[in-house]
Swiss-Prot record:
Catalyzes the synthesis of activated sulfate. Keywords: ATP-binding, Kinase, Nucleotide-binding, Phosphoprotein, Transferase. This is Adenylyl-sulfate kinase. The lineage of its organism: Bacteria, Pseudomonadati, Nitrospirota, Thermodesulfovibrionia, Thermodesulfovibrionales. It comes from the Bacteria. It comes from Thermodesulfovibrio yellowstonii (strain ATCC 51303 / DSM 11347 / YP87). NCBIfam families: apsK (TIGR00455), PRK03846.1 (NF003013). Its EC number is 2.7.1.25.
Amino acid sequence: MKKSNNNLTLYKGYINREDRERLHGHKSFVIWFTGLPASGKSTIAHLVEKELYKRGCSTYVLDGDNVRYGLCSDLGFSIEERKENIRRVGELVKLFVDAGIIVITSFISPFKEDREKVRSLFKEEDFIEVYTKCPVETCSLRDQKGIYKKAIKGEIKNFTGISAPYEEPENPEITIFTDIDSPIEACQKILRYIKDKLKL
């Protein structure tokens, strides 16, 4: 999408990210979940948020389906529209992190290039990519929405894992084998990583 920012000026206020982090009592960062549909992204993301909330952290979960009800309601599922979806989400997450909030996202985000563009918006220590790795057969079996069946029948076009590709992350900070680890085990693994890396 073409930018039209020739006459714009980035305004900086009196309060910065560090001020907001002090107010919240912790660092802000993003936990970016990526993986096939029904691989466990949203379930684990909300468990992580629940545990961080118990610890007094200011958090927010951005979920792929929810975002498409509002911010990205004008987008379909073509390759270009999927790329624009992730671009918008990346910019939104950047604002949340600047506000001093821990942002947890749950998006298929199937293309490596798009994930790397989002990563480039942040300092290295502020971006934690979590890959929920799961065989497509297992995802299909646990699919409560019935979307895999529709995709296999051809009723849903450009469905990731069936009729559209998913490019696996090469070096995610965390890989969760969700056909082996339970959601609670996955949540604890992520919390240990956060504690060790960010001294939360």
